[in-house]
Amino acid sequence: MDYLDLGPYSSASGTVRLPGSKSISNRVLLLAALAEGDTTITNLLDSDDTRVMLDALGKLGVKLARDGDTCVVTGTRGAFTAKTADLFLGNAGTAVRPLTAALAINGGDYRVHGVPRMHERPIGDLVDGLRQIGAQIDYEQNEGFPPLRIKPGTISVDAPIRVRGDVSSQFLTALLMTLPLVKAKDGRTVVEIDGELISKPYIDITIRLMERFGVTVERDGWQRFVAPAGVRYRSPGRIMVEGDASSASYFLAAGALGGGPLRVEGVGRASIQGDVGFANALMQMGANVSMGDDWIEVRGIGHDHGKLDPIDMDFNLIPDAAMTIAVAALFASGTSTLRNIASWRVKETDRIAAMATELRKVGAIVEEGADYLVVTPPQRLTPNAAIDTYDDHRMAMCFSLVSLGGVPVRINDPKCVGKTFPDYFDRFAALAKA
């Protein structure tokens, strides 16, 4: 097995320019593909998840011209030209869920599949929502999970569509992005949420990007969403992908644990991503944080004793960035509790179980529940722990931070960061110092 040995490091400082946001990149690619006109996308993330989206769009007949981190997408005016396609989408939820919805109304015969873990990640609530408007979608293996077979359906919207909100916000994102292309009786489509909607900031990203392409969604709280029906997306001409706020979390934490000053560029006060809220969680733990419109800087911890304060917080809004807090909790002066993180269980791996297992390897006492994690840091970190990453990019990036505790750490299968941040370890090593 490939591995990477990091540290021991005693400090981290410098400036890092973030790669483009995964969440924004894949949404913008699909919106541009469905729009009228050409869209020039800049700062597009180059990673496994964006590559599978680009490959799929190419197979569906979308004209794409790539040059570095710029991509010109020629829109299809709401309908893909290819009426049959076999689409392998890796482990990219941001590709599988929205594309499934777009294909369901495209009147073609499609197969959607991915890596084995993708076939364990739920999609049943989205399929149920699409079947309510007449979509023909069959499960090839297990009910509620990919691979999927999508066939032409008689699509009509004559009642509100109901979808669960407590498993993944990507189901709602997929419906919101697709439904404006469908004709409806009274010229509008309504989506109603059953239960609590998780990861609300990601829905905010979807709505704001749809608006850039000329379609406005109105929401009544977080339970009811109304969009115009039978309309076309219009290209904004140019759109820049802001830096990835989830990826920023590792460097911001490094600036706290390694003394800083460490500045990330590409996200800040003006960001549309909820994960910039990670900076607030770090501040609650005692880190010195300052922020501009498109930068955030951390200068160590504001205590003489050099330890973070423990935190007890609901992370429903920022589940991805919360993983970084779980590792930062190793450097706290007491026990931290991460609450409302049930969605971790259906991500790239079961992140609650994986995080608990690997935190114990470095000496922490960990209690895991259905939707929470309690982390008590050790007196001193266990050196030379071999961290398993479960083919999960965020596990690998999170546990790089252990090396800032003055102990070496081994990261198994470091290439899994290719999902969102292929050169992460090079960037991290450039900022960390012995």
Curated annotation (Swiss-Prot):
Self-association and partners: Monomer.
Catalytic reactions of this protein: 3-phosphoshikimate + phosphoenolpyruvate = 5-O-(1-carboxyvinyl)-3-phosphoshikimate + phosphate
Entries under Pfam families matching the protein: EPSP_synthase
Gene Ontology biological-process annotations: amino acid biosynthetic process; aromatic amino acid family biosynthetic process; chorismate biosynthetic process
Family note: Belongs to the EPSP synthase family.
Gene coding for it: aroA
Main localization of the protein described in the UniProt heading: cytoplasm
CDD domains in UniProt: EPSP_synthase
Source organism of the structure: Burkholderia ambifaria (strain MC40-6)
Sequence positions that bind phosphoenolpyruvate: K22, G93, R121, Q170, R351, R394, K419
Full protein name: 3-phosphoshikimate 1-carboxyvinyltransferase
Keyword Cytoplasm (UniProt): yes
Stretch forming the signal peptide: none
Pathway: Metabolic intermediate biosynthesis; chorismate biosynthesis; chorismate from D-erythrose 4-phosphate and phosphoenolpyruvate: step 6/7
Catalytic machinery residues: D320 (proton acceptor)
InterPro entries: Enolpyruvate_Tfrase_dom (IPR001986), Enolpyruvate_Tfrase_sf (IPR036968), EPSP_synthase (IPR006264), EPSP_synthase_CS (IPR023193), RNA3'P_cycl/enolpyr_Trfase_a/b (IPR013792)
Function: Catalyzes the transfer of the enolpyruvyl moiety of phosphoenolpyruvate (PEP) to the 5-hydroxyl of shikimate-3-phosphate (S3P) to produce enolpyruvyl shikimate-3-phosphate and inorganic phosphate.
This protein's UniProt keywords: Amino-acid biosynthesis, Aromatic amino acid biosynthesis, Cytoplasm, Transferase
UniProt lineage: Bacteria, Pseudomonadati, Pseudomonadota, Betaproteobacteria, Burkholderiales
GO MF term set: 3-phosphoshikimate 1-carboxyvinyltransferase activity
EC number annotated for this UniProt entry: 2.5.1.19
Residues where 3-phosphoshikimate binds: K22, S23, R27, S168, S169, Q170, S199, D320, K347
Broad enzyme group: transferase
NCBIfam families: aroA
